Regions:
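Active-site neighborhood of glycoside hydrolase catalytic domains
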Residues: 369-371, 408-561, 571-573, 582
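Short, well-ordered beta-strand segments enriched in hydrophobic/aromatic residues
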Residues: 129-137, 499, 636-643
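Glycine-rich, aromatic-flanked loop segments that form ligand/cofactor-binding clefts
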Residues: 58-94, 218-243, 285-304, 341-347, ...
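Aromatic-lined carbohydrate-binding/catalytic grooves of carbohydrate-active enzymes
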Residues: 309-443, 449, 453, 464
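Polysaccharide-binding surfaces and accessory modules of carbohydrate-active proteins
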Residues: 2-249, 266, 666-669
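Carbohydrate-binding surface patches
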Residues: 219-222, 618-657, 686-689
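C-terminal beta-strand-rich structural cap/linker in extracellular carbohydrate-active enzymes
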Residues: 672-695
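Short Pro-Gly-centered flexible turn/kink motifs
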Residues: 92, 270-289, 685-693
């Protein structure tokens, strides 16, 4: 028997126990567990390693793992083409506990024989942690790295004493235009991640999204679940460029890590001059005793909440790219009766009849907006804050700025200007002249014309690489970092400005962009029946208080359709659009009733926790069954239900823990009896909502 010697350093943060494991070679890893389950930890590191026996299926094998993974360019890769994670050559140096205005936590320093240092900072915030990983070059020469993790949760699950067959699941969330947020749940066996007979050469699952649409394939959030114990570990990245996550089996346990896409994923290489450092994107991690939604909720609770839940009107689904000044004033005359706070001019204001073509100069077309200052003045006098749409990161065919004479200011790949579909090119935000130009065209324009809201759209993906750095992936990362800095500058220059984050709907619903903006467009599913399905999906991925959900109302909509649309929007922030100037009085009455109900939901949307139940089918485009969204705080419960095709059946929700009726919105087929909410007689594409309060 070979004895593994590991020492532990333990820290307790409210309900979470953090332990750092350090072996005799000074390799260090970290486990986090719910404090209430600390005594159930199975210390595989204290179990003897038996003599190798190829026929022993239960032969104990354990690997300590790491708290951070890094790879020096040119050094050997243990499993090339598969994973760049391995023993890093970084060993434990020192550790310190800290308390600051940002929270409390632990800083761990790892050292490398060549003079490099990794600084790993774990900060406790509201039931979870942020992780910041910094590579410091204290050597006497420059160094190139081609992989650096943001976080690493190793030794999963610490509650199992062996390789735990049939006890683990891995949960990911899929992106896709107008199909955002589908949960993909697979056992580790379905991922072909069983432990091998030898305990080494085990598998991994590396995934992520490449390019400038960070939620195009997957969302940068995932959950590892021990279904036997009922514990979930979740992680989320702040990254608006190419990112990756990886679930790797090392012997009996798993390593769950993530960060920037590495060289094998996207060709990333970063040069760090001597005396300088580089920080990986910030990560959020949590560990809960509960379900996937509990773990995701713990991640979201660490991030900024909305200040308000005011309703937004956006005229896009009213004019479909043909806004005018007269139309906006006419709409606002009706909107003020509904108490709408923001009214947004969407695409089409630069050139009449051109929704997205010819953008780049950002000059108002005075044939359709003859006096924009007077318009915004009138809107404010009606109590409505004016907003306007930009896609300022690009130029499009038909604009002077799209022409070749401005190519020197554009992003290039292999010397050629990056264009999508041949009609959209991209400013290089690393250039000062680009930032200065857009300061005048965007920030000064907003200031001088009285706008208090900007919808920032982004309708193209640059692809993986941009010239001008040590690797194409690093060029793109730095460009998108500068884009984010421009968003921050808008808020610095106009402190009261409300900024909406949009990228063909939900392609930028990641934490680094959502946390510096006020709200985000949930999807481009403007009028689709799957709106409530998508909106509910996203409760695991973003704060509902920042989730702007379309409610498009047309003059030929019947009561059921209006209620269906409004109830879907109650799952986040209401974004009203449609024939607002053509509705009949009875239709306005439904809107007024709905908005009165919505005003009562502020606290529960901001601070609640969501569970989705019912029997909805797997297709979003052709939904079936019934979706019931339950959102709870300690004092309130919101129930929003939607019927799709084949929506027969009766559904019961237990409220025996003390909730009573407070208000409802067209919940005519729901009743409260014997400590239950009973929903029955659902018809296709109908909906209702109930608000309850604790006795």
């Amino acid at each position: 028997m070979n004895e593994v010697i590991v020492r532990e350093k333990q820290y307790v943060f409210e309900n979470i126990d953090v332990r750092y494991l350090i072996d005799k070679d000074e390799n260090v890893s970290m486990i986090i567990v719910p404090r209430e389950l600390s005594e159930q930890i199975q210390k595989q590191w204290n179990m003897p390693i038996p003599k190798f026996d190829a026929r022993d299926r239960n032969m104990h094998r354990w690997d300590i793992g790491n708290i951070a993974y890094a790879h020096i360019f040119g050094e050997p890769i243990e499993q090339p083409g598969k994973t760049m994670k391995a023993n890093t050559g970084f060993t434990f140096f020192e550790q310190e506990y800290f308390e600051s205005g940002k929270g409390e936590g632990v800083v761990t320093y790892l050292k490398h024989i060549d003079g490099y240092v990794i600084k790993h900072t774990l900060t406790y915030i509201k039931g979870g942690f942020t992780v910041e990983t910094e590579f410091v070059n204290n050597s006497d020469s420059d160094v190139k790295i081609d992989m650096l993790s943001s976080f690493a949760l190793d030794n999963l699950s610490p509650f199992q004493s062996d390789d735990a067959p049939n006890k683990y699941k891995f949960h990911r969330f899929l992106g896709g235009w107008s199909m955002e947020g589908r949960r993909l749940s697979q056992s580790v066996e379905e991922l072909n991640l069983d432990r091998t007979w030898a305990g080494f050469m085990c598998g991994n699952e590396k995934f992520g999204t490449r390019g400038s649409f960070p939620c195009n394939k997957y969302f940068p959030i995932a959950v590892f679940e021990d279904t036997d114990i009922g514990v979930c570990w979740a992680a989320q990245l702040e990254c608006n460029s190419t990112w990756q996550m990886e679930l790797t089996r090392f012997a009996n346990t798993f390593s769950f890590s993530g960060g920037l896409g590495d060289r094998e994923f996207c060709g990333w290489v970063k040069n760090i001059p001597k005396g300088k450092s580089f920080c990986a994107p910030k990560a959020y991690v949590s560990c809960v005793r509960g379900k996937v939604n509990d773990a995701c909720n713990a991640l979201l609770n660490m991030q900024p909440n909305a200040d308000e839940l005011s309703i937004v009107f956006n005229e896009y689904c009213t004019t479909w790219g043909k806004p005018t000044q007269d139309k906006m004033i006419s709409y606002c005359q009706r909107l003020k009766e509904l108490g709408i706070k923001y009214a947004v001019i969407d695409a089409g204001w630069c050139k009449a009849g051109c929704e997205q073509d010819g953008n780049g100069e950002w000059n108002i077309d005075k044939t359709i907006f003859p006096n924009v200052k007077e318009m915004t003045k009138q809107m404010r006098e009606m109590g409505i804050i004016p907003g306007i749409w930009f896609e300022f990161e690009v130029t499009t065919d038909g604009s002077v700025m799209f022409e070749p004479r401005y190519d020197y200011m554009k992003l290039k790949d292999n010397g050629k200007v990056i264009k999508t579909r041949g009609i959209r090119s991209y400013w290089d935000f690393r250039r000062e002249d680009v930032r200065d130009y857009l300061y005048e065209k965007v920030i000064r324009f907003l200031k001088e014309n009285g706008f208090g809201y900007i919808k920032v759209d982004y309708n193209g993906n640059t692809g993986l690489w941009a010239d001008g750095a040590e690797s194409g992936a690093e060029g793109l990362r730095r460009h998108l970092e500068c884009v984010r800095e421009f968003f921050i500058k808008m808020k610095q220059e106009i402190p009261d400005l409300v900024v909406e984050n949009c990228a063909s709907g939900g392609n930028r619903l990641e934490a680094s962009m959502m946390n510096i903006t006020d709200l985000s467009s949930f999807s481009d599913a403007h009028e689709a029946v799957e709106i409530p399905y998508i909106a509910a999906n996203l409760h695991n991925l973003m704060r509902p208080s920042k989730e702007l959900v379309w409610a498009v109302i047309h003059s030929d909509d019947d009561k059921d359709r209006i209620v269906y649309s409004l109830c879907a929007a109650f799952l986040g922030r209401v974004c009203l659009s449609g024939d607002i100037d053509k509705l009949e009085n009875w239709q306005y009455d439904i809107l007024k009733r709905g908005f009165d109900f919505y005003q009562k939901l502020s606290d529960i949307i901001k601070f609640g926790k969501t569970t989705v139940c019912g029997n909805r089918g797997k297709s979003m485009r052709h939904p079936t069954g019934v979706q019931i969204v339950i959102r709870k705080t300690e004092s309130e419960m919101l129930v929003v239900y939607h019927g799709f095709d084949d929506s027969d059946g009766e559904f019961e929700i237990d409220i025996s823990d003390g909730y009573i009726f407070s208000d409802s919105f067209y919940a005519d087929n729901a009743e409260i009896a014997d400590g239950k909410i009973i929903i029955k007689d659902m018809k296709p594409y109908t909906s209702g909502a109930l608000l309850l309060e604790r006795k």
